[in-house]
């Protein structure tokens, strides 16, 4: 159990880290201009039969929850889909036509000088165009005819208002995973939406933390040591921790929340995996937003190790040992040159 003074010191360090890593105005402006350039390049074209469309933003950028080198998540939506109708094209029913559309759009982005070496990931669950923007150096992902990410923005805004500690926690947890290569869904890591849901779910169910230091340490302990991936899944709306039930795993587990419920089927209607992370999408109840995070167990092991390292550091401080100027350095200390270089590059864009 850490003393109040050491947790207050950790709390202040978390505030300082967030103040440094949080988006600056010129960074947001450069990203705004990038969106406009892409919109100008694609918005004037008719990518779908007999229907125009538009570029929309989603994810960490419009929510203001991104790190300096974070990629941009965009979607090109037809007017029909945007106005409440069905998609003009669906990858599941017409993969060939969908892939052709993405390839044509990627060629357009390269032709006008925006995209550097764009490529299409056609076989993903959500097909995308990936490229690096020539001007900013930022990585960009563009999907087509999928508004699920856009619809989540209202949820982010609501959570930011209800749980003000979320902003600081997101920055910390993202940085912890970025430094260990566990923050990208396409490599099996935890995506931004999953990270946010983990944090919000913890805040909703845990005892109210005294400060950010207490909250962060509790988060690391809960997901690193107490949360059983094989037995539990997370429901965001309404908030609950549910038991996974499958033919392989009869559940008798009870821990952490008085609102622990039991489910007889998985989020997507299929048998629950007893090795993966399951988080029910608050805006699409049959969608497991962490379904692609096959390395979730590695991420949770990182949380466990970070908790132990941080707890040892705090204990050493309490005992009067010299730990240096930073507590957080033991888990997120490192080379931040990539952030400095990216910020310098964006600051020079007129």
Where does each model-flagged region fall?
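Eukaryotic short linear interaction motifs
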Residues: 63-66, 74-75, 82-86, 127-128, ...
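Basic, alpha-helical interaction scaffolds
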Residues: 153-192
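Conserved catalytic core of two-metal-ion nucleotidyltransferases
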Residues: 94-148
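Surface-exposed beta-strand-to-loop junctions
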Residues: 8-22, 74-87, 110, 144-154, ...
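N-terminal regions immediately upstream of nucleotidyltransferase
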Residues: 1-69, 81-100, 120
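Pol beta-like nucleotidyltransferase catalytic core
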Residues: 6-15, 201-350
């Amino acid at each position: 159990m850490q003393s109040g003074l050491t947790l207050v010191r950790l709390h202040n360090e978390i505030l300082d880290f967030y103040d440094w890593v949080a988006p600056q105005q010129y960074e947001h402006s450069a990203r705004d201009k990038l969106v406009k350039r892409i919109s100008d390049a694609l918005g004037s074209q008719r990518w779908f039969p007999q229907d125009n469309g538009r570029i929309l933003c989603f994810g960490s950028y419009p929510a203001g929850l991104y790190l300096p080198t974070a990629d941009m998540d965009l979607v090109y939506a037809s007017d029909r889909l945007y106005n409440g109708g069905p998609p003009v094209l669906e990858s599941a029913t017409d993969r060939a036509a969908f892939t052709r559309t993405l390839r044509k759009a990627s060629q357009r982005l390269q032709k006008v000088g925006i995209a550097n070496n764009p490529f299409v990931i056609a076989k993903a669950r959500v097909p995308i165009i990936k490229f690096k923007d020539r001007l900013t150096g930022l990585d960009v992902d563009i999907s087509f005819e999928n508004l699920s990410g856009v619809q989540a923005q209202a949820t982010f805004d609501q959570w930011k208002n209800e749980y003000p500690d979320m902003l600081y926690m997101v920055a910390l947890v993202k940085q912890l995973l970025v430094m260990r290569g566990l923050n990208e869904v396409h490599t099996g890591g935890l995506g931004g939406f999953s990270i946010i849901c983990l944090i919000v779910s913890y805040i909703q169910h845990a005892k109210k933390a005294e400060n950010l230091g207490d909250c962060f340490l509790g988060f690391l302990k809960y997901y690193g040591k107490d949360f059983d991936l094989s037995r539990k899944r997370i429901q965001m709306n309404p908030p609950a921790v549910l038991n996974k039930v499958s033919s392989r795993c009869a559940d008798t587990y009870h821990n952490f929340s008085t609102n622990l419920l039991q489910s007889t089927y998985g989020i997507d209607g299929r048998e629950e995996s007893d090795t993966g992370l399951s988080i029910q999408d608050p805006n699409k109840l049959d969608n497991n937003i962490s379904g692609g995070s096959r390395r979730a167990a590695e991420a949770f092991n990182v949380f466990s190790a970070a908790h132990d390292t941080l707890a040892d550091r705090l204990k050493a401080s309490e005992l009067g040992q010299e730990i240096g100027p930073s507590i957080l350095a033991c888990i997120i200390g490192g080379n931040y040159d990539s952030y400095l270089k990216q910020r310098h590059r964006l600051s020079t864009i007129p």
